[in-house]
Each structure stands twice: as C-alpha cells, then as structure tokens.
Amino acid sequence: MAAALLALAALPVGAAEAPLALAWRTPAGNELLELDRSRVLARGPLPAERQAPLGSLWKLFVYAYLVDRQQPDPGYQCLGHDRDEVYCCNPGERIDRDQALVKSCGLYFDPARLGVTPDDWSRYWQARSAPAWLQRLDALKPEARVPVADLLAQLQTLPAQDEARRVLLDVPLQARDAGVLATLGARLRVKTWSWLADADPQARQGGFAGWLNDGTPVWAGGPGTSQRVLGQYAEVLERTLPVSWPREPGSCVEVRLFSRYPLREVSLAGQSTPVAPGALRGRYQVLFENGNRLDIESQGELFLERRDDGLALTAHLEREDYVARVLDREAAPEPVEAAKALAVAVRTYLVQNAVRRGECLVIDDSSSSQRVAPRPASAASRTIAAWTADLVLAGSTVTYHSERAGPDRLSWQQAVTEAKEGVRYDSILARAFPRASLSRWDKPVAACQALPNAEDWLRRQRREWRPVLDAEPGYAEIPQFSVCRLASGRPHVDRERRRIFVRGLFSLQDRLDLTHEYLHLAFEAHPNGQDEAYVERLARQLLLE
C-alpha cells in the first residue's frame, strides 16, 4: 500500500491521470488518501516527505495571528489601482478581515500594511513551537514547499481556529459551482489554495486546507485550481468525508417543553411517586392536568421547575441538538434531502423567532412555533443536523407545515415528494423560498436583494405578452421566479434558483435586460433558449412593437 501511495505521489500534478490527494489527522496518525472523481484509489499513512506549495494558505496563518492577538480590523479599500484587487472587491468597495480570508484577498493580509514585523511574528510562533518555515515571515510565500504533515499539525493547534471555522463556511456558500454546497453541505471549513503546477508552470494545482466541522485537520491537493478541485471532486468527497458532530454545536437553546399543556407531576418510569424539582436523568413519565401521560428521557438536559403558575419542564440544548430533536418531532430524518431542507428551515425559524436571554436563545415547544422531542435525538436526525450545521436562509421569513405549501412556507409533504424525485435540499429550499439564500448562522446575508417593483412589472407585462409568447415554440411560463439586484457584471439568470439578476427598472435598457433574461428562463427546455439572437429579437419585439 505504501509503495502504491508513493508511486501515485510521484505523478506530475498536471498529468491528466493525477488523482486528488486528501490528508487528515486520525487517532492512529496522519492518513493520506488518493481519489479519482468516483472512488478512493489508495489509502495509507501520510509519508513524512510529502510536500506541497503553501499557496494562499499563508493568509490563514496571518488571520490566526491577527485574531488571536486581538488586532483591530483596518479593512481594505479597493481603489482600482492594483490588478490583485480582483480577489478582494470592486473599486470603491471595502472588504473586512473575514471576507478577505474567504475571498483570498492577499492585499488585505500584506504583513507590511498590517504593521506585522518579522520579530513580532517570529516570537509569536516560536512560543508555539511552530516549524521554522512558519517562524520566518519572509519565508511565508505561496511558492514555499512545506510538509503536509506540518500543515496538519499546525491546523490542529492553530489559534483562533473556532473563528476561522465559523468564517470559512462561506467558502462552499460562495463557491462558483453551486453543486459544492449542495453536495458537501457544511462539513468542510477550509481555506482554498492554488499555485503553479510542479511539472508545468503553465498549468495550475490547487486544493484546500482547514478542518472538518468536528475540528479534524484536513488538506487536499490536485490538478487545477481550487475551485476546479472543489467542483469536480465534490461527489467523491461527499462519499469519503465522515459526517461528525460539529466542534462548535451552537449556543444554548432554552425550551419550555409542553408550554401549552399544564403539568400535574413527573415520576420515574415504572414508579408512581412524583420526583422533586431539579435536573432529570433517566426515563420518566409526565402526567398532564388533562390526564394524558407521555414518556420522556433525559441525560441531564431536562430540568423540572416549580414556578408561580405550576410545574414547568425546561430543556437546555445545544443549538444543533435542538435542530435534530425538532426534526424527530415534526417530521423524520428521511428522505435525506427533504430532511436536510427542513433542518435548515428549523434552524432559520429559531434564529428569526427565538428571544435572546443572556447567552441562550429561548423558545417555546408548541405547535404554534416548533415542537421538540422530549428525548435524545435519533442518530439519523443528528447526522442531518451535523451535515447542515450553521446553515440558515437569509432574505425571507421562514415557516413550514406538514402538508400545506404557501408563500415563504415549506411543505414537508411536498419536500418528501421532491426528494424522491431526486431534487437536492438546496433546490427544495429554493422552490419554497425563491427570494432566500443559504447563508451562515452568525452572519445571514441574502444573495438576492429583491427588486419587487421589477418583478411586479414583469408579471404584469407577461400577461399582456401571453398571446405572442404562447405562439412561440418551446415557451413555458415560469410560475415562480425572483428578480434580484445585480451587484456587478452583466445581467444573467440563475436557472437552478429561478433568479433574474438585473440592475433595476430605470431605463429602456434595464427593461430589455429583464425581458431578455426572463425569456432565457422561459425557453430553457428548448433550443431557442440558447439562441441569443432569437432571445434578443423576441425581447425587442415584446417591448418595442
């Protein structure tokens, strides 16, 4: 096995047959896997001599240094004078430290600009017994070749890694290929890297390094840019990476169980004597004032309290445990894609509706909000919660119902049907919440800044255009779509999410752009939808004649 791995490792990275190398730390030591786009080709110990270019991973170490030393964030203002600003922001815009890490903005992390001196840097990393290449600021270059084992060791103990993991969820969220997030979910918290290929300076190699969401250090490298690696290897990574409980499962959620049903007493299972208020451990039976009984189970997270209005049963849960318990109570962990969609909706409902009390979020267990299972979550639901950890929707109010769909409401029954048809969770959510975008818990940002006036205009015009459009081969009216503000670039459509990105509705050109892009959607199942000349001619006919 070791010989096979060394042979694979010796292949030029730019060669067509070169596999993706994936390394991580395990309890038994560092492990190296070699993968093609469909399977694991080889697995064995990570050779100590295995090296890779540092690429843009140097920015992760500068980020950790700045955050750990509590250095103020000076931001970076793009003025349009430096071509490397393409990795940062548009002229006139400003980027902060977290955004700079995700976008790999080297101009932000320039040590001289930040006032990081070689002596301060060296002392800081020497105190942490870092390898020599990390102690020298002048050696922290993208072309520097460093042992992969060193990278994994430093990631294991990196300062500020909790903050980095939180921020780096934006890497799959902002990936050019939407399939990365759809396939991998929230499991990878990694900084991407790219550099010149070893054997061909005209080619590229790239990958990522960081953590799985349980804190396991991970590194990957293969042919092509980092975005190409993520996109082309997402499917095999999905099958290879474990789904583990997150290292940071979220702040506490305080839930008053059975908030609408007064309690008479709580007793140990099989006994009739009521238990005293306090933390509960074991199996119990709840007797309600209406005479109904219910079995519950606690591992110390449920508390029986005596309040002015009677007995109360309160659960103190980690956020992701809360999501898993709601999933068990409101629906089921299967079909998996439907369950993933509902888990995101549950988490979003929590952040939109809970009341903050100190470090905890407070929400009732009620059919008018979200019902919570009064027992440990099933392993299957915990897996769904872990796979989607920290993912929420931004841009819409989120509700859900077991059967009824509606504006900004997810129907579990409909989600199940769509999942069985092969629809992935992100598309299930996009259909239920067309204006919303997947985002992260601590900083929900909507990718679609809705233009309601433009959407209303298009819907009105569409009714007038119907006689003309219905006569065109391949036309299919789109029942649900969103019109979003275009931040930069050319007008376009996101077919998967049914979104039209335009500048506004201020001029004739804006209206032409909006009509043109809508027609691309409406003819997407017909060759006419790919014919730019046809689409533009029809758009002008509709607007100008």
Q: Where do the language-model regions lie?
A:
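A short, well-structured edge-of-sheet supersecondary motif
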Residues: 16-44, 208-213, 217-221, 483-484
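Conserved, single-site charged/polar hotspot
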Residues: 15, 165-189, 197-205, 209, ...
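Catalytic Zn2+-binding segment of zinc metalloproteases
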Residues: 69-70, 518-534
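Post-HExxH zinc-binding segment in Zn-dependent metallohydrolases
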Residues: 90-91, 95-99, 461-477, 526-545
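Active-site scaffold of zinc-dependent metalloenzymes
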Residues: 478-511, 524, 538-540
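Active-site-adjacent helix/loop patches that line small-molecule binding or acyl-intermediate pockets
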Residues: 18-22, 76-167
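Short alpha-helix carrying the canonical HExxH Zn2+-binding catalytic motif
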Residues: 54, 58, 506-522
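Active-site SXXK
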Residues: 50-74, 100, 256-258
